[in-house]
Swiss-Prot record:
Keyword match Endoplasmic reticulum: yes
Localization terms from the record: Endoplasmic reticulum membrane
Taxonomic path: Eukaryota, Fungi, Dikarya, Ascomycota, Taphrinomycotina
Gene it is expressed from: gpi12
Primary localization: endoplasmic reticulum
Keyword set includes RNA-binding: no
Organism: Schizosaccharomyces pombe (strain 972 / ATCC 24843)
Pathway of action: Glycolipid biosynthesis; glycosylphosphatidylinositol-anchor biosynthesis
EC number assigned by the record: 3.5.1.89
GO-annotated cellular components: endoplasmic reticulum; endoplasmic reticulum membrane
Keyword tags: Endoplasmic reticulum, GPI-anchor biosynthesis, Hydrolase, Membrane, Transmembrane, Transmembrane helix
Topological domain spans for side Lumenal: 1-7
EC top class named in words: hydrolase
Protein name: Probable N-acetylglucosaminyl-phosphatidylinositol de-N-acetylase
Length: 248
């Protein structure tokens, strides 16, 4: 058993050391303007970190982020808005490209029901204003099952139908075992990349990228850094790799 886990760890480290080579499909993101759509400040780092860090360092691509609420469930909305700007700067994203929605119909909360039409309205406004070519958001499981995350997907699906010239990619949710095996998830993800699906993009964060993502979370979203967030930072596979699938 020790031999088995040691082999997995060594393989994972090898993948990390050649992260760029292990990633696949990034050319599909080679567009002038990309929009990340998520529900709460800190979603960008907790879930989309490898992708947003990769794109933020591609100087030919303008990266915008659209946060559909200010995360005011605990009364810290104004603080969290500012924290998002700080975190975005770690990915080389200018504050003018950070957009936070203030809509009474889109409030942070597990019990808050977001109408996909309202979500799509706000997404469409940013797409039109900034000539967005590609949109990246959650899939239909929302990684954690959070209803606000799932509403992002449902709103994006309306964009797929109404604006077919905009390509939409969704972040793949995985089972709870894979979610919390950190770098070891590079193994099943690497196997997945060998399948060569044309509608899939796989991005592995190298050591420097992973450190930037952690820095964005810890130094950016200070109000959210309770004890279990550190567990996420060091155990979640979403801090080290993302799998994006084309939505149709």
């Amino acid at each position: 058993m020790i031999w088995f886990w040691s082999t997995l760890l060594v393989t994972a480290i090898a993948v990390l050391s050649t992260a760029n080579e292990s990633s696949s499909g990034q050319e599909k993101l080679a567009v002038e303007s990309i929009l990340f759509v998520f529900a709460h400040p800190d979603d960008e780092s907790m879930f989309f970190g490898p992708t947003i860090d990769y794109l933020g360092n591609q100087h030919s691509t303008r990266v915008h982020v659209l946060c559909l609420s200010n995360g005011n469930a605990d009364g810290l909305g104004s603080v969290r808005e500012k924290e998002l700007v700080v975190a975005a700067s770690k990915y080389q994203i200018d504050k003018t490209n950070v957009h936070v929605v203030s809509d009474p119909q889109l409030q942070d909360g597990m019990q808050a029901k977001w109408d996909p039409t309202d979500v799509a309205k706000h997404i469409s406004q940013i797409i039109e204003r900034y000539n967005i070519k590609t949109l990246i958001t959650f899939d239909n499981k929302g990684i954690s099952g959070h209803p606000n995350h799932i509403a992002c997907y449902e709103g994006a699906m309306k964009i797929v139908k109404a604006t077919p010239q905009v390509q939409v990619f969704v972040l793949e949710s995985v089972n709870i075992f894979r979610k919390y095996i950190s770098y070891l998830d590079t193994i099943p993800t690497l196997v997945q990349s060998q399948a060569g699906r044309n509608d899939t993009i796989i991005i592995h964060a190298d050591r420097k990228s992973t450190q930037r993502i952690r820095d964005a979370m810890v130094r950016g979203h200070k109000s959210q850094m309770v004890w279990f967030r550190y567990g996420w930072i060091y155990l979640s596979k979403y801090m080290s790799n993302n799998v994006l699938k084309r939505a149709t």
